[in-house]
A protein has these predicted regions:
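A conserved segment at the C-terminal end of the G1
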Residues: 211-227, 231
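Non-catalytic signal-transmission and effector/linker regions of two-component phosphorelay proteins
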Residues: 1-12
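Hydrophobic anchor at the beta1->P-loop junction of P-loop NTPases
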Residues: 199-201
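Cofactor-cradling patches in redox/metallo enzymes
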Residues: 21, 28-133
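The conserved Walker
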Residues: 20, 205
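Extreme N-terminal, non-catalytic leader segments
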Residues: 131-197
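Conserved small/polar residues in nucleotide/adenosyl-binding loops
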Residues: 240
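Conserved glycine(s) of the Walker
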Residues: 208
Length: 240
């Protein structure tokens, strides 16, 4: 049965991963491709990822949502810890979605969603909604613009060590540059006071961009322990 894909109205970023001590990555690999095909940017971390890794990535990317699979039996603690970490790190706006087939029992799904997890999809959901239907539900719930509350005063509070503040300003410029021209001008003015070299690395998929960047950064930091370097990555498949 053909279903009409939900089309997001905003730029939606979703961090995907399989849980810690979990090598079952087939499901999340399918899900992430469908999420991407529904119009979202996907940051995929792979399998065997800790709650801390997932949450830190979501904050650094200023993501709208986290989508996880958990088939190793520790889902109750794992999902709740991610929920708690997001609030501990002052990022409660990031939504949490997950699934684990028959491993997550109906009463556990109920408990997790009452705890605050936005949605745990069950095998029954898969049968009733279909794969695209579940992803449409996830994307629709995550369809909001990030960076809306950032103002000029926030630019003065940017710290190199604070990835969250940097990510939020990037989101604000990406999503609200027309509505907030003063924000863009303030950033341009601030940039005038710095003489920092900028190196761009580009190439087709599989050309070795990440490997080259990794090697350059490693050598730079080994030779300059007191220096700092920032890396901004852009999805090469982006249409913009």
């Amino acid at each position: 049965m053909e279903t009409q894909k939900y089309q997001p109205n905003n730029k939606v970023r979703v961090v995907t991963a399989a849980s810690l001590f979990d090598g079952h990555d087939a499901a999340i690999n399918i899900m992430r491709r469908v999420i991407q095909g529904t119009g979202c940017e996907v940051i995929h971390l792979g399998h065997d990822k800790s709650a801390e890794e997932v949450v830190n990535c979501a904050i650094q990317e200023d993501a709208n949502a986290i989508a996880l699979t958990s088939y190793q039996g520790g889902h109750n603690e794992y999902f709740k810890y991610i929920y708690d970490l997001l609030r501990e790190k002052n990022s409660p706006q990031i939504k949490i979605f997950g699934g684990g087939g028959g491993v997550i029992l109906p009463e556990e799904i109920k408990d997790l969603m009452e705890y605050g997890i936005d949605r745990i999809y069950s095998p029954d959901d898969g049968r009733e909604m279909g794969l695209q239907g579940m992803i449409d539900d996830l994307v629709q719930k995550s369809d909001f613009a990030t960076g809306e509350n950032i103002t000029v005063s926030d630019i003065e509070n940017i710290k190199f060590e604070d990835a969250k503040s940097i990510a939020q300003v990037i989101s604000a410029v990406e999503n609200f540059s027309d509505e907030k021209p003063e924000l863009v001008e303030a950033l341009k003015e601030k940039a005038k006071h710095f003489n920092i070299p900028i190196i761009g690395i580009t190439g087709t998929g599989g050309a070795g961009k990440s490997s080259l960047t990794d090697e350059l950064v490693r050598r730079f930091l080994r030779a300059n322990a007191d220096k700092k370097i920032a890396i901004i990555s852009v999805d090469p498949r982006s249409e913009e």
